[in-house]
């Protein structure tokens, strides 16, 4: 498994270190979505329930076991090695549409070849599907996509020429996050996939703050109705965004907002 592989490679690294190494310890989490939040991850590492902390203090001041803590995404650590070995010029030589570098895009959904694809930063979803995923699955026509996982919002196929990078989607109310892209087709509808995402957030909410705990539950009920109460949904979304204490609650309404904004035909 992955853990055994990592333990084997760490043993090799310690046996022949390229430099003085810090103490390295592997900790296995229970897989809760909330533990992707920086302070909830620290709570989990400390053996406690994964719940986000109120800030300040920030984890850079008071982190794991009360010590200043620097957190990195694993992909960041991977690219540090590549850039040191191959130099920055190599990394920045990749990219499209004015963006620089490479990204690991995790593509799932209605494509022929789902999986993790290493592609240039700034590639569009249409290019990613055609060049790296061998096109849409047979019998399916591209209809829409989540550009950044369940909370990254939803965009229609007509907006499939937007470069995918860290700040290119902000103006559309979406974000790329960890580049976990979900593609759906004309066999699906945006209402259902958005409701499915909200049900996921309801299940994964840690329950610490009311806007997220109650807001996700209320949103699922509203999204299950034949006719959406758009003014109430907008009010609920604003409350969740403004008052939730961590990114889960703040971003949970993004898919719902996207349907209201980009898929109005489904609400008639």
Predicted feature residues:
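Ferredoxin-type iron-sulfur electron-transfer modules in oxidoreductases and energy-metabolism complexes
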Residues: 8-22, 164-268
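Hydrophobic alpha-helical positions that pack around
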Residues: 3-121, 133-136
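Short, structural beta-strand-to-alpha-helix junction motif
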Residues: 123-128
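Short acidic/glycine-rich loop or secondary-structure boundary segments that cap or lie
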Residues: 115, 153-156, 192
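Acidic, glycine-rich active-site loops and adjacent beta-strand->loop/helix elements
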Residues: 1-2, 30-31, 149-152, 198, ...
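Terminal amphipathic helices with adjacent charged low-complexity linkers/tails
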Residues: 1-3, 8, 24, 137-171
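Active-site loop ensemble at the mouth of alpha/beta enzyme cores that anchors a bound cofactor
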Residues: 44-56, 158-175
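Short polybasic amphipathic segments
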Residues: 105-108, 143-145, 181
